[in-house]
C-alpha cells in the first residue's frame, strides 16, 4: 500500500455543499483551479462493498468546512468523475470542488468524463503523466481497470476508488470510499414487501447505466428479495442511463407494452423517476400514494425528497453524494504515514411519503427537506 510520508497532524471533518444544476453532455474537460471557481457538473453510484468502516459523510443540516491540508505544501489531487447526468452527480462534483479547494490547501485537477469509459482511462493516464500526488476515480464501468491502476502503482501514486466499485484486485488501489448499493436495493425491496403486505406486485424496472456498479448493486439487491416473493413478478427492465430523458423514454416504451398490467415502477435514480412520472402523467396513469402505481426511487436528492414528501414518490432510498470529506481523511492519513481503512462505507438511509409505512424507512418531513444540502 503506497503511503506518502509528510509530517502533519490528521484533521478530519466533512463537507456539505449546495446542489448545482445539471449540465448538458459535452466533451470531457479538465479543470485545475480552486473548486469554487469550477463549474463542471456531474451522475450516480455501485455494487456491495466489504464493510470495514462506516463513516457519516455529513449532517445534511451542516455545511461544515473540510479538515483541510495541514502538510504545509499544496497537495495535488486528480478526480476522474463519471459525468454530469444527474442531480446526484452534480452534488458529488460540487462536494469535491469545495473540499479540495485552493483555500483548503489543494490543487484539484477535475475531469468530467461524460460517461465515456475510454475518456476516463485517458484522464487517469493524464494524472499519472502530471505526477499528481493522489488520484481519485469514480469509475464509469466496473471492468478494464487493471492496466491503468498498475501504471499508477508503478508511478508511486496512491489511488482511491470512490462512489462505485471496480472488478480489479484490491492490491491495485489504496482505498475505497462509497455506499453499499446492493444494500440499497435490498432496502427498497424490503420496504415494498412491508407496504404491499402480501399483495401482488407487477414490477417494471428502469435501471441505471449498463455496466455501472450502482446499477449492478441495486439490481442484485432488489432481485434477491424479490425472489423470496412468489406474488411478485418483474415484467421488464431496461436502462434509462440515470437520466430524466432516459427514464421518460423507457417508461413510454413500457406503457405501450404493459399498460394496465403494472402497479410498481422502480427507478434506479431520481432523474429517471422524474422522466417516468412525466411519461405516466402524459398517459393519464396515476402514481404515488394516491395513485395506481407505486414509485420507488434512489438517490434521495432534494427534489426527489420533495416529490416523496408530496406523495408522488412512495419510497426514496438515499445514496449519499457527500463523500469528499471522507476521501480527504484518507488522503491526509496517507500523507501523514498514518493507518487508514482500506474500505469506508458512507452512511445513507431511506425515506417514505408521510403516513404509509414505518419499519424500513424514515417518514419524510418538512424539517428533513429544509435541512437537505443536496
What does each model-identified segment do?
Residues 88-102, 106, 184-191, 213-232, ...:
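Short, solvent-exposed amphipathic alpha-helices that sit
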Residues 75-103, 108-126, 130-132, 138-142, ...:
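Extracytoplasmic "Venus flytrap"
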Residues 18-33:
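Bacterial lipoprotein signal-peptidase II cleavage site
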